[in-house]
């Protein structure tokens, strides 16, 4: 008998563990207790990745049920999730709001950024609280990536995961995108691998060098040049041991003192 098609593969579980999606925080909201697998000796709570996978499947079904993909709004005020929501919007046709959420975007129709979405997805309920609050005023269902200490008020579907790590946030958004495309039929078979790698959803520091190997080679080359210059200078100094060092041009004999008693007194102004 074949396994259910919606069950996670060993590769999916390995990816979740490698991205540290199961690492929670030391505090737990009472609503998030069912998602906690156990608590480590240092007080950090471990999230059950099985619950994470179930909620990813549920969220993907809800997203795929929206007829117009543009009516799904993905929001991330947290820096680590901004790249992920932009890629999710690109692959699934949703609307992305990366960065600061303009207050009144869901409630004030006079503003230019006014939207009437049918579904809202947020990266962190704590940083995206303004969007969740406005969604509750206009009856918009909310899907949120929640940690063990995240508030879940006005959140309809909570995906338990580590929403503070760049790899964890990117991987969860990547899995949601993949499952949505599978349900829509964009991917031929569930056994077919998606050509998009999870690394594309990970946050990248703009100041970080693009290729670490090239940066390491440049650093090694500079070190070799500096070492050769130091050795050449040491060899030059070793050949001139017989030459006495030159005295400084501005050097003076501070030990010698003058007899001030013999000096003429300064003239006194009348």
UniProtKB/Swiss-Prot annotation:
Write out the transmembrane intervals. none
> What processes in GO biological process is this protein linked to?
cytoplasmic translation; ribosomal small subunit assembly
- Gene3D superfamilies, alphabetically? Glucose-6-phosphate isomerase like protein, domain 1
Task: Spell out the residue ranges making up region: Disordered.
Answer: 207-270
Task: State the GO CC annotations.
Answer: cytosolic small ribosomal subunit
The GO molecular function terms of this record are: structural constituent of ribosome
Cited Pfam families: Ribosomal_S2
What start-end ranges are recorded for coiled-coil regions in this protein?
A: none
| Chain intervals with Acidic residues compositional bias | 207-225
- Stretches with biased composition (Low complexity): 226-258
> What job does this protein perform?
Required for the assembly and/or stability of the 40S ribosomal subunit. Required for the processing of the 20S rRNA-precursor to mature 18S rRNA in a late step of the maturation of 40S ribosomal subunits.
Q: How does it assemble?
A: Component of the small ribosomal subunit. Mature ribosomes consist of a small (40S) and a large (60S) subunit. The 40S subunit contains about 33 different proteins and 1 molecule of RNA (18S). The 60S subunit contains about 49 different proteins and 3 molecules of RNA (25S, 5.8S and 5S). Interacts with RPS21.
Return the similarity comment: Belongs to the universal ribosomal protein uS2 family.
Q: What is this protein called?
A: Small ribosomal subunit protein uS2
Name the gene behind this protein.
RPS0
